[in-house]
């Protein structure tokens, strides 16, 4: 007796099923990933249960998953010889959304079996993804250890109900036949199915097989007979996960080949880290540092992240939740035993487990970079040339690791007058003068502009090293990285130089004397430039240049203003502080000028020169040229 019955889905919500079928997954081909994953689950369940009762194997312990297509009938079939289902479990588990036999099975495991289990079907709705491409789904199954006549047929069109019927099934396990919708017949193609299996299920430990047609006897090119070959089931996936093997058993060549496989990069990786984490969270990570920056590294619309596997089954590319944005160049994967996922597996749940994994993986990458910088400085310089600007985003994004990130940064400096960015903050501190308590830096549009800035004159004279920053992100960086190892970073173009103990008494006395003698000059310049500057004062930083402009404490620097303007952000009105060098011949000439109009023109000319030196451009270059020509003509008359 067939005992055919019709049941309504226990959720009793046809609309929910339809919504899930059409909206839950972001691409249709995922149906095969889900069904192959379920089949692998069934094999794993049988493997574990057979440890204590090997009669469940029924004389066949070669577990496998098989996928086949029939173009004429428009069907795709996925079968396994795993644990199978009884009639009751079919009704319970295939009749309820978000109910999973695997999850229930998993909760009953304990000890080492639980740790090593590769049961991935804790999501409850994977089976129903079949209806994304199928107008009808037929399931034939028999539980291991049960008689052949205890097989079950389950069939549904995904319309809110399903039929269940008892059948005879000689082989244990489950066979799922998808009757494809007319518009989805592309999936009834062996090549299409092979490509999906390779993409999503390459590293499932259970062999995934497809039928390889035999060939008839034929004539060779020289007339010889070529023997016929028989058709056979051929394994499509590697059926091994490299990252689950012992590190000592994996060669460098294997690591590099695997990197190329997952990254689609043609060149070798620079470095990698393969690590197994056990404890509260259990996962394996295999992280690669590329040798070259990917072409899309600066594309903010493109997702960057790690491949995510759960129990060796590919879940998604570009899982962004496990690394901060400033490490978006890292390639690799994570394979979790207990990672919580949303039911669709498409969106990771943002919770404490995910956060803890992110913290651990971030520390792992930073540790890898620190080791590279220490042990292979030349290799690290190659890395820095490719990814340094991205790493500079770190202090703003990752407060907890700010000090570690700062230790990885490299800059040009006045130490060797080279444009090469090879100087670490650690090395700078080691070379600091006795009594120096600040790390001095300058940010400019180019290395040349930074290296030749008049703001460096006194510091060069005293032999004080200055970091030369000239990348667009540098101003953003120093706004978030204000100190390193208790040494404050101090801009030489902002406020006072604050030399502290580096300023000897004789210099200070000389400066104070010049400032006192120049009070009248300062007042005249203030009056002449009242609309253009916020303050005029005697400089303490210039030795060879007549004047310069600096930003006041708490005011935006020139570079930050440029950044804001480039981003289309409103910039508050501000006027610079104008510093003059009374010992310079041009300023002495200015001081001796009795004609107030000429005095104002000279003062304005010096200001425009200082602004040009600082900004690289002027708001009104034509007016500056006119003024310059006017002063030149006056001097030759």
UniProtKB/Swiss-Prot annotation:
<comment type="function">
    <text>Molecular chaperone. Has ATPase activity.</text>
</comment>
<keyword id="KW-0143">Chaperone</keyword>
<dbReference type="InterPro" id="IPR020568">
    <property type="entry name" value="Ribosomal_Su5_D2-typ_SF"/>
</dbReference>
<keyword id="KW-0067">ATP-binding</keyword>
<dbReference type="GO" id="GO:0005737">
    <property type="term" value="C:cytoplasm"/>
</dbReference>
<feature type="region of interest" description="B">
    <location>
        <begin position="346"/>
        <end position="562"/>
    </location>
</feature>
<dbReference type="InterPro" id="IPR037196">
    <property type="entry name" value="HSP90_C"/>
</dbReference>
<feature type="region of interest" description="C">
    <location>
        <begin position="563"/>
        <end position="637"/>
    </location>
</feature>
<dbReference type="GO" id="GO:0051082">
    <property type="term" value="F:unfolded protein binding"/>
</dbReference>
<comment type="similarity">
    <text>Belongs to the heat shock protein 90 family.</text>
</comment>
<keyword id="KW-0346">Stress response</keyword>
<dbReference type="GO" id="GO:0016887">
    <property type="term" value="F:ATP hydrolysis activity"/>
</dbReference>
<keyword id="KW-0963">Cytoplasm</keyword>
<dbReference type="GO" id="GO:0140662">
    <property type="term" value="F:ATP-dependent protein folding chaperone"/>
</dbReference>
<dbReference type="InterPro" id="IPR036890">
    <property type="entry name" value="HATPase_C_sf"/>
</dbReference>
<dbReference type="Pfam" id="PF00183">
    <property type="entry name" value="HSP90"/>
</dbReference>
<protein>
    <recommendedName>
        <fullName>Chaperone protein HtpG</fullName>
    </recommendedName>
</protein>
<dbReference type="InterPro" id="IPR019805">
    <property type="entry name" value="Heat_shock_protein_90_CS"/>
</dbReference>
<keyword id="KW-0547">Nucleotide-binding</keyword>
<dbReference type="InterPro" id="IPR001404">
    <property type="entry name" value="Hsp90_fam"/>
</dbReference>
<dbReference type="GO" id="GO:0005524">
    <property type="term" value="F:ATP binding"/>
</dbReference>
<feature type="region of interest" description="A; substrate-binding">
    <location>
        <begin position="1"/>
        <end position="345"/>
    </location>
</feature>
<dbReference type="Pfam" id="PF13589">
    <property type="entry name" value="HATPase_c_3"/>
</dbReference>
<dbReference type="InterPro" id="IPR020575">
    <property type="entry name" value="Hsp90_N"/>
</dbReference>
<comment type="subunit">
    <text>Homodimer.</text>
</comment>
């Amino acid at each position: 007796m067939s005992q055919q019955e019709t049941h309504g889905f226990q959720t009793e919500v046809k609309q929910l099923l339809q919504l899930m079928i059409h909206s839950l997954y972001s691409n249709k081909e995922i149906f095969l990933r889900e069904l192959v994953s379920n089949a692998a689950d069934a094999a794993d369940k049988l493997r574990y249960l057979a440890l204590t009762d090997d009669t469940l194997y029924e004389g066949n312990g070669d577990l496998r998953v098989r996928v086949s297509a029939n173009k004429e009938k428009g069907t795709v079939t996925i079968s396994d010889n795993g644990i199978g289902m009884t009639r009751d479990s079919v009704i319970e588990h295939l009749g309820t959304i978000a109910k999973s036999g695997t999850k229930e099975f998993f909760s009953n495991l304990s000890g080492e079996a639980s740790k090593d289990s590769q049961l991935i079907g804790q999501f409850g709705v994977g089976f129903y993804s079949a209806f994304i491409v199928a107008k009808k789904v037929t399931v034939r199954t028999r539980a291991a250890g049960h008689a052949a006549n205890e097989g079950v047929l389950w069939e549904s069109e995904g319309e809110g109900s399903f039929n269940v019927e008892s059948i005879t099934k000689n082989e244990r396990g489950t066979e799922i036949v998808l009757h494809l919708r007319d518009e989805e017949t592309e999936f009834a193609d062996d090549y299409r199915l092979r490509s999906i299996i390779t993409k999503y299920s390459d590293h499932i430990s259970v062999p995934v097989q497809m039928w390889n047609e035999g060939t008839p006897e034929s004539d060779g090119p020289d007339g010889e007979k070529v023997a016929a070959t028989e058709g056979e089931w051929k394994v499509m996936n590697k059926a091994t996960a490299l990252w689950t093997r012992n590190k000592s058993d994996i060669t460098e060549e294997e690591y590099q080949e695997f990197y190329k496989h997952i990254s689609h990069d043609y060149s070798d990786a620079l470095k990698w880290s393969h690590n197994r984490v056990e404890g509260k969270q259990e996962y394996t990570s295999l992280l690669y540092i590329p040798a070259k920056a990917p072409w899309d590294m600066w594309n903010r619309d493109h997702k960057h992240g790690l491949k995510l596997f759960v129990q060796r089954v590919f879940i998604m590319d570009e899982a962004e939740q496990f690394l901060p944005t400033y490490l978006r160049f890292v390639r690799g994967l994570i394979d979790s035993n207990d990672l919580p996922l949303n039911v669709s597996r498409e969106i990771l749940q943002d919770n404490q487990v995910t956060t803890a994994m992110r913290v651990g993986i971030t520390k792992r990458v930073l540790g890898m970079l620190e080791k590279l910088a220490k042990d292979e400085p030349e290799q690290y310089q190659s890395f820095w040339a490719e990814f340094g600007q991205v790493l500079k985003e770190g202090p703003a994004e990752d407060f907890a690791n700010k000090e570690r990130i700062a230790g990885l940064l490299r800059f040009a400096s006045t130490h060797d007058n080279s444009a090469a960015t090879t100087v670490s903050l650690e090395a700078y501190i080691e070379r600091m003068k006795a009594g120096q308590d600040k790390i001095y830096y300058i940010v400019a549009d180019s290395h040349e502009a930074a290296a030749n800035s008049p703001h460096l004159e006194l510091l060069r004279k005293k032999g004080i090293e200055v970091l030369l920053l000239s990348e667009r992100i540098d101003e953003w960086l120093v706004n978030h990285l204000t100190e390193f190892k208790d040494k404050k970073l101090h801009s030489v173009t902002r406020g006072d130089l604050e030399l502290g103990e580096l300023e000897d008494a004789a210099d200070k006395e000389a400066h104070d004397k010049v400032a006192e003698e120049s009070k009248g000059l300062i007042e005249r310049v203030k009056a002449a430039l009242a609309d253009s500057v916020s303050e005029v004062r005697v400089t303490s930083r210039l030795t060879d240049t007549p004047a310069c402009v600096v930003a006041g404490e708490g005011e935006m620097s020139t570079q930050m203003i440029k950044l804001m303007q480039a981003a289309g952000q409103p910039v508050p009105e501000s006027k610079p502080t104008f510093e003059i060098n009374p010992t310079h011949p041009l300023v002495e000439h200015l001081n001796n000028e009795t004609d107030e109009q000429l005095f104002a023109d000279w003062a304005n000319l010096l200001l425009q020169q200082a602004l040009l030196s600082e900004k690289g451009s002027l708001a009104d270059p034509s007016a500056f040229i006119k003024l310059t020509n006017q002063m030149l003509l006056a001097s030759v008359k």
